[in-house]
A protein has these predicted regions:
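Short secondary-structure boundary/capping segments within folded domains
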Residues: 14, 44-47, 55
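Conserved acyl-donor/pantetheine-binding loop and adjacent beta-alpha core of acyl/acetyltransferases
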Residues: 66-99
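A short, polar/charged loop/turn motif at coil->beta-strand junctions and beta-hairpin connectors
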Residues: 6-9, 62, 90
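Conserved beta-hairpin
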Residues: 52-69, 102
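Conserved GNAT-fold acetyl-CoA-binding loop/helix
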Residues: 24, 28-49, 75-80
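Short acidic N-proximal helix/loop "leader" segments that mark the beginning
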Residues: 1-5
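A short beta-loop-alpha structural element at the N-terminal edge
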Residues: 10-23
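Hydrophobic adenine-recognition pocket in adenosine-nucleotide-binding enzymes
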Residues: 15, 99-101
Length: 103
């Protein structure tokens, strides 16, 4: 989906495996090392819920992303960040694991 502004157009799309390095780098720029998800975490997130992992690009550069699974669990708990077992598209709850925007 293209988003037109007065200046440069933006593209909003679902993330793919080709985005892993850029997503990991942006996460590292936005969060302290103890809190930032690593490449392997993003890899399983993409495999588990790619259809709920969105990236925003400007001039071909990834500048922002948001991701999180749908689940049957009402509350976000720490264990969700470490295991794809909570992913369930038949659930009623959309979790947000992270939002990162280029500084």
């Amino acid at each position: 989906m293209d988003i037109q502004t007065d200046q440069t157009p933006y593209t909003l799309r679902r993330a793919t495996e080709a985005d892993l390095d850029a997503v990991t780098a942006l996460e590292a720029a936005c969060f302290p090392p103890a809190e930032a998800a690593d490449r392997s975490a993003f890899d399983w997130r993409l495999r588990c819920y790619a259809h709920h992992f969105w990236v925003l690009e400007r001039e071909g550069q990834l500048i922002s992303f948001v991701n999180g699974p749908v689940t049957k669990e009402r509350d976000l708990v720490d264990e969700m960040f470490a295991s794809p077992t909570f992913c369930d598209d038949s659930g009623d709850w959309q979790m947000i694991f992270g939002v990162a925007t280029h500084p």
